[in-house]
């Protein structure tokens, strides 16, 4: 096998028929477009979503919902993720340095998912009730 002998399998490539080249070609005269009407003309396509002047469905249906601006700067961290952070004190800066939250985050909440075995001090983060109990049971403390 050589690169210059490569060819598609017979019948795999269907050659296109030229349109409007006589009645004998099978696609003469109207060229497969039918008679008259907007779609038979050159450039005669309708844009997507156009329904002939009727109010389109994307405008008939109501808008709903919104994106909370606070969710763009808020994040959550689990106890199992905090257990991996080096150091005794865990704050927003240490979480950013460890790569657990993005730099643009302003608020972080600690959730009780997973376990923590060493004593850590949570500084300046919101903590759920279950996470607070787990941290204090491990010998750590929470400073708001």
Swiss-Prot record:
Q: Which UniProt keywords apply?
A: Ribonucleoprotein, Ribosomal protein, RNA-binding, rRNA-binding
Name the segments for region: Disordered. 1-59
Q: Which InterPro entries match?
A: Ribosomal_uL15, Ribosomal_uL15/eL18, Ribosomal_uL15/eL18_sf, Ribosomal_uL15_bac-type
What are the Gly residues biased-composition ranges?
Answer: 21-31
Query: Sorted alphabetically, which Pfam families does this protein's record hold?
Result: Ribosomal_L27A
Q: Which residues form a coiled coil?
A: none
**Domain of life here?**
Bacteria
GO BP, sorted A to Z: translation
Q: Which GO terms describe its molecular function?
A: rRNA binding; structural constituent of ribosome
What are its GO cellular component terms? cytosolic large ribosomal subunit
What is the protein's known function?
Answer: Binds to the 23S rRNA.
Query: What PANTHER family does UniProt report for this protein, alphabetically?
Result: 50S RIBOSOMAL PROTEIN L15 (PTHR12934), LARGE RIBOSOMAL SUBUNIT PROTEIN UL15M (PTHR12934:SF11)
Q: How does it assemble?
A: Part of the 50S ribosomal subunit.
Q: Which family does it belong to?
A: Belongs to the universal ribosomal protein uL15 family.
Query: What is this protein called in UniProt?
Result: Large ribosomal subunit protein uL15
- From which source organism is this entry? Pseudoalteromonas atlantica (strain T6c / ATCC BAA-1087)
Tell me the name of the encoding gene.
Answer: rplO
């Amino acid at each position: 096998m050589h690169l210059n002998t490569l060819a598609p399998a017979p019948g795999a490539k269907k050659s296109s028929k030229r349109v409007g080249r006589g009645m004998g070609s099978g696609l003469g005269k109207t060229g497969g477009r039918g008679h008259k009407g907007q779609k038979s003309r050159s450039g005669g396509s309708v844009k997507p979503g156009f329904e002939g002047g009727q109010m389109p469905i994307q405008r008939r249906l109501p808008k709903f919902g919104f994106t909370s601006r606070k969710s763009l700067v808020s994040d959550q961290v689990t106890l199992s993720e905090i257990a991996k952070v080096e150091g005794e004190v865990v704050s927003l800066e240490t979480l950013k340095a460890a790569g657990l939250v993005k730099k643009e985050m302003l608020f972080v909440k600690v959730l009780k998912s997973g376990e923590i075995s060493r004593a850590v001090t949570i500084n300046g983060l919101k903590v759920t009730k279950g996470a607070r109990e787990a941290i204090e049971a491990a010998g750590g403390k929470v400073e708001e």
